[in-house]
Amino acid sequence: MAVADLQGIQAGIDAGVDRIELNNHLELGGLTPNFDLVAKAVELTTAAGIDLIVMVRPRSGDFNYSHLEIETMLQTILHLRALGVRGVTFGVLTPKGNLSRHYMVELLEAAGSMEVVFHMAFDDIPHENQSMTMDWLLDHGVQRILTHGGALSQSINTTMDWLKETIANAPAGMTILPGGGVNYENAGIIANELSVSELHGTRIVKLV
């Protein structure tokens, strides 16, 4: 469940979600939250026994970052490690939309033993290169990929075929997390059609 504040975290805990992804500015696709919020989120999720994943994304827009932006992301990851965060989610691409392996290695090294989820930057990678990208990520310790199966402007109903193909092509050990447009009303249908047990969304459970 993706949230942007403490109220969202508590609501997710009360609803019994397995994992919480903390962001800032969900309306922009999620950006890095402030560290004070993260520290409080660590306390809440640790007490509840729920994994906390924190977004590492310095700005909205594309995922082709400058050297200065990468340095910011590196420092962010190190700070999150010091705060006791369980995992982080990020993604870096080249100007042509392929995986930026050099920068990814730097960020993965900074993450150390934290879980790393490759976020929806995956959907900007050309379809013909996504399979090799999954292989590379798994070889470098990334075991979860968040994907909508296409542009977020498309309904998830129109990207189901590609999601099925992505899941079928995923190497053993890689978990594909369908997201973007998944909510408590359609989650069961989507999970059944894709034969997955994990989904991602801001409204993945019905809040009371």
Residue ranges of model-derived segments:
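Hydrophobic faces of well-ordered beta-strands that scaffold small-molecule active sites
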Residues: 1-3, 20-22, 50-56, 88-90, ...
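Catalytic cores of alpha/beta
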Residues: 4-15, 61-79, 116, 123-140, ...
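Active-site-adjacent beta->alpha loops and helix N-cap segments on the catalytic face
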Residues: 6-10, 26-51, 67-71, 93-112, ...
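Small-side-chain structural scaffolding
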Residues: 9-17, 41, 85-91, 110-111, ...
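Glycine-rich phosphate-binding active-site loops on the catalytic face of alpha/beta enzymes
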Residues: 17-31, 79-96, 140-155, 182, ...
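A short, flexible beta-alpha/helix-coil linker loop
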Residues: 26-27, 58-62
